[in-house]
Regions:
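Intrinsic-disorder-associated, low-complexity terminal segments enriched in Asp/Asn/His/Tyr and depleted
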Residues: 4-7, 26, 65-66
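Short hydrophobic alpha-helical segments enriched in small aliphatic residues
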Residues: 8, 25, 51-54
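Cationic, low-complexity basic patches in intrinsically disordered or flexible, solvent-exposed regions
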Residues: 10, 18, 36-40
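Serine residues within intrinsically disordered or low-complexity segments
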Residues: 18-21, 28, 64
Length: 574
């Protein structure tokens, strides 16, 4: 942040009514995703099933018939002709540290993304979304941000970022970046200043500090546990406690502080001025908090979607959070076209429309596909709820099968499809035990994944594609525990509830011949190669190990096979 930290109110948000709250289209929409007519939805899915040769096609054929019966209407109202370019787009999520390493450091970087821009253009996507690339201690994969207006020097520079933006825009590809407004890194200058300033200071007002309970304040203010395990409060040297919904290294901002509002309005403007087209808002449901009540111990602060439907939870999905996004909308509308935003908000389907309305963020991820098994009724419900939520908000539907937080869908579809009543319980149990508890039927998982992308592209709205799913990658379940990076694993234990999310974050395979060398043919992981992720003369190994079976999924192998998953994606996205 390079602004006036002491400004009494948001620097970019003071009564500025420039522009319109209605987004408009500045790019023609490709024929494959025109108005969502009933016939198009049905026949698109039918062709998908035929092409994928899925013997369980009756699951989605049934969904298709129900969509026809429901009589899907175009989401158009009077806003139709001015909908955002994102209303009908395919967006490719890049996890930068695992996409392409241009320097040999073992970490993917910004220049690596630029190097592969032709690959992205050929894939046929309209936009790329970059997970955090900011300076960070990397406690949580970059979601612990130490500086919101710079590039982590291990990943490049602002000049590299500008080059990447220019390369993307030259190919007609938009760029979306991650914004992390719920918390910062504990290495952020603001938090260091808060620790130094002491209780009651303006510096501490930027974060959520509270006195403890008990005779000497030795007990935390509430009994909450954090999302990644352990308590949600950490005590500092002078005896106060600070809140962190995730790790102790990620202290939560206090959004009742005007300086926090000013910071993020200026951050949004900083990146928009550099040419960024939009923003993905991390933990969008968590910013507004009410800790001045007596029933706090009755709640949990985990980011699930089973909170109260009336916005009464003390820290998650409160109605006041939308005041923040209405403020941001004024910043977005200063640009022509207005900056785009999408909420990562794990909230009930009945609350999604609040985030997706045109005067709010404008779009919200629908994670129902990412949560459902390959079961007809579950998939049908996911589609119904997604369409209804979009219709209610005046926005467009979104479809997400995989991302950096969930087990890859090719693996989920390859495991037994047994409803457990809990989110991903079976895949997470399978992962926790290094992929040994259930048989992964990869042939079936691949067939289902092929059908799934065709179904997704037949539906109205935006599709989000996670890097590697276009290769048909499966989850890497057996990463050695001592090489895991995800705090949701290392803050628990091998007998706890999760092994973490690293299995979907393994660096991509680009060249099959550059395979790691195995000390023993039975070894799963080797050394000395990176499947083209890093340069041939790289001095460092990839930051996560790549399994030997990656050679069959390398980009060069799949590019040469007309029937590969990659070429299927290229056809359906073209």
């Amino acid at each position: 942040f390079r602004g006036n930290l002491g400004h009494p109110e948001p620097a970019r948000c003071r009564g500025r009514e420039s522009g319109s709250s209605v987004l408009f289209t500045n790019r023609s929409i490709r024929p494959r995703r025109l108005e969502p007519e009933r016939e198009r939805a049905f026949w698109g899915v039918a062709v998908a099933l035929f092409a994928a040769n899925v013997r369980f096609g009756r699951i989605i054929v049934g969904i298709s018939h129900n969509l026809v019966a429901r009589e899907i209407r175009p989401m158009a109202t009077e806003k139709s002709s001015s909908r955002s370019w994102m209303s009908d787009a395919a967006i490719y999520q890049i996890y930068p540290r695992s996409f392409k390493d241009s320097t040999g450091s073992g970490l993917g970087d910004i220049a690596g993304i630029t190097q592969q821009m032709d690959y992205l253009e050929r894939l046929g996507i309209e936009a790329i979304w970059l997970s955090p690339f900011y300076p960070s201690p990397l406690v949580d994969g970059g979601y612990d941000v130490a500086d919101y207006c710079d590039v982590d020097p291990r990943l490049g520079s602002l000049d590299d970022f500008d080059d990447m933006i220019a390369a993307a825009h030259a190919r007609g590809i938009k760029v979306i970046v991650d914004i992390v407004p719920n918390h910062s890194s504990n290495q952020h200058p603001w938090f260091k200043a808060a620790l130094a300033a002491g209780s009651g200071s303006p510096e501490r007002a930027r974060y959520i500090f509270r006195d403890g309970r008990g005779e000497h304040g030795e007990l935390p203010p509430t009994n909450w546990n954090a999302n990644f395990g352990g308590p949600a409060w950490t005590r500092v040297a002078d005896g106060q406690w600070y809140l962190h919904m995730f790790t102790p290294e990620q202290p939560d901002f206090d959004w009742s502080c005007p300086e926090v509002h000013a910071l993020f309005c200026d951050v949004l403007a900083f990146w928009s001025d550099r040419g960024v087209d939009g923003f993905r808002i991390d933990v969008a449901q968590g910013l507004a908090k009410d800790l001045d009540r007596d029933d706090l111990d009755d709640y949990v602060v985990w980011c699930t979607n089973d909170q109260p439907e009336d916005g009464s939870h003390p820290v998650i999905d409160r109605d006041e959070v939308h005041d923040i996004y209405h403020e941001w909308r004024k910043v977005f509308n200063e640009y022509d076209p207005p900056a785009f935003a999408v909420a990562e908000a794990w909230v009930r389907p009945s609350r999604q429309h609040l985030y997706a309305s045109p005067d709010d963020l404008g779009q919200i991820f629908n994670f129902e596909f990412a949560k459902k098994d390959w079961i007809r009724d579950d998939m049908h419900l996911a589609i119904e709820e997604g369409l209804e939520s979009a219709e209610r908000s005046g926005s467009t539907a979104t479809w997400v099968m995989s991302n950096h937080d969930v087990v890859r869908h090719a693996t989920r579809y390859a495991l037994p499809q047994v409803p457990t009543g809990e989110y991903h319980r079976l895949p997470l149990d399978w992962l926790l035990r290094d992929g040994t508890t259930y048989r992964e039927d990869r042939a079936l998982g691949t067939k289902r994944a092929r059908a799934a992308i065709m179904m997704e592209m037949a539906l109205p709205g935006s599709a989000y594609v996670y890097q590697g799913e276009e290769l048909g990658l499966f989850e890497v379940a057996d990463i050695p525990w001592d090489e895991l990076e995800d705090p949701s694993a290392w803050r628990t234990s091998r007998s706890a509830s999760t092994k973490g999310r690293d299995g979907c974050r393994v660096p991509l395979p680009w060249v099959a011949a550059d395979a790691p060398q195995l000390d023993d043919p039975n070894d799963e992981f080797g050394h000395g190669g990176s499947f083209g992720f890093s340069p041939a003369d790289a001095k460092a190994e990839p930051h996560l190990p790549q399994p030997k079976w990656y050679k069959d999924f390398a980009v060069d192998v799949e590019s040469a096979d007309p029937d590969s998953m990659l070429n299927l994606y290229r056809r359906v996205l073209a």
